[in-house]
């Protein structure tokens, strides 16, 4: 009878607090991943939905509409972007601040800048807040380790025709509907077909 309450060897019982913290960390990592995917697809509606409704935009403006306009202006100056996030340190708030967290996210970015292809090493300094059970960005500061031009612009390569070919230009992000919507009617640095893909 005395053995009934003993845990199985090698098996740990997880406390509710520990489970909640692990869940919060997983949710915040998904938030960061969604940011990268939405930005690269130019899904600006999805992107701004990752921020708190009263997000501060500049000194005097708040709200997702203003953030949408800010992203649209910034992204109009570049072409294709590829954000690859990696190291992610998360510090959850303590007692009395359970719905707050901060984080540092390391990111390697590839950016089309006209005819140039740029690599950047970035650290995002983030502030997160849980709103109605969902973790969102309060603030995201882009900090740069370096930016360097790569010798060959991959968008100037012939089509890869994947999976037949392993090298060359692929079809992303040009076939993403949100990318096409973002680029419709926009001047491009190169002639494009009706999907926004360079010819």
Give short role names for the model-derived ranges.
Residues 5-37, 41, 45, 49-53:
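Short, low-complexity N-terminal intrinsically disordered segments enriched in polar/charged residues
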Residues 83-85, 118-125:
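Short, surface-exposed coil-to-beta transition loops
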Residues 110-119, 147:
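Short, cysteine-centered beta-strand-loop-beta hairpins and adjacent loop/turn segments enriched
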Residues 39, 51, 107-109, 141-144:
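Short beta-strand segments enriched in hydrophobic/aromatic residues
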Residues 44-113:
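A solvent-exposed, acidic/Ser-Thr-rich amphipathic alpha-helical stretch
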Residues 1-13, 191-199:
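N-terminal amphipathic/basic-hydrophobic helices that include classical n-h-c signal peptides
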Residues 150-199:
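Acidic/histidine-enriched, glycine/proline-rich intrinsically disordered or flexible terminal extensions
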Residues 12, 100-102, 123-157, 162-167:
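Short beta-strand edge/turn micro-motifs at domain boundaries
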């Amino acid at each position: 009878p005395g053995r009934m309450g003993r845990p199985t060897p090698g098996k740990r019982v997880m406390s509710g607090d520990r489970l909640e913290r692990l869940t919060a960390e997983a949710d915040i990592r998904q938030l960061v991943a969604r940011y990268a995917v939405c930005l690269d697809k130019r899904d600006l509606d999805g992107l701004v939905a990752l921020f708190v409704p009263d997000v501060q935009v500049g000194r005097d403006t708040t709200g997702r509409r203003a953030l949408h306009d800010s992203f649209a202006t910034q992204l109009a100056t570049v072409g294709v972007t590829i954000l690859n996030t990696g190291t992610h340190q998360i510090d959850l708030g303590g007692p009395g601040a359970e719905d707050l967290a901060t984080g540092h996210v390391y990111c390697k970015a590839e950016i089309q800048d006209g005819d140039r292809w740029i690599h950047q090493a970035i650290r995002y300094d983030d502030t997160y807040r849980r709103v109605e059970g969902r973790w969102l960005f309060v603030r995201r500061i882009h900090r740069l380790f370096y930016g360097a031009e790569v010798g060959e612009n991959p968008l100037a390569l012939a089509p890869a025709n994947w999976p037949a070919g392993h090298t060359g230009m692929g079809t992303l992000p040009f076939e993403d509907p949100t990318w096409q919507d973002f680029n419709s009617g926009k001047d491009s640095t190169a002639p494009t077909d009706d999907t926004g893909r360079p010819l």
